[in-house]
């Protein structure tokens, strides 16, 4: 049998008939229709909204309003100060890997961010994910350049 558009049909057992509730005991879902005996969930109409606790003060109103919250995926940086870059040779291209080889960084796990603490008199080309304004100022004042990378 060839596979054509008109010969396609669902797999055996994939399509089930709609359950007709309240159509007699022999139908399997008669009498209380699978809703149990009595109570709010057995009545007609819309069910209770999510978070409704039967009139009890709900959890979202019992807990205090929190002022601050932590970010789910914060940006993490490996930081280095401009003063630490001063011990590198002039004309060096500074990256996260080159700083690890030089022994300035110990764990290059995250993206590199350059902070502006310390003095710099050496011309460097710095590749980093972020710079503070003072760090960028000091690097460019020494004749170097700052390049943003991802």
Swiss-Prot record:
Q: Name one GO cellular component term.
A: cytosolic large ribosomal subunit
Highest rank taxon of the organism:
Bacteria
Query: Which Gene3D superfamilies does this chain map to?
Result: 3.100.10.10
Pfam families from the UniProt entry: Ribosomal_L27A
Query: Bias regions of kind Basic residues — which residues?
Result: 12-23
Q: In its keyword annotation, does this UniProt entry include RNA-binding?
A: yes
**What would be an example GO MF term here?**
rRNA binding
Provide a GO biological process annotation.
translation
Disordered as annotated region, ranges: 1-57
Which keywords appear in this protein's UniProt record, sorted alphabetically? Ribonucleoprotein, Ribosomal protein, RNA-binding, rRNA-binding
Q: Kindly give the InterPro entries that the UniProt entry links to this protein.
A: Ribosomal_uL15 (IPR030878), Ribosomal_uL15/eL18 (IPR021131), Ribosomal_uL15/eL18_sf (IPR036227), Ribosomal_uL15_bac-type (IPR005749), Ribosomal_uL15_CS (IPR001196)
Compositional bias of kind Gly residues = 25-37
Report quaternary structure and partners.
Part of the 50S ribosomal subunit.
* Annotated function: Binds to the 23S rRNA.
> What's the family?
Belongs to the universal ribosomal protein uL15 family.
Q: What is the official name of this protein in its record?
A: Large ribosomal subunit protein uL15
Organism of this sequence: Synechococcus sp. (strain RCC307)
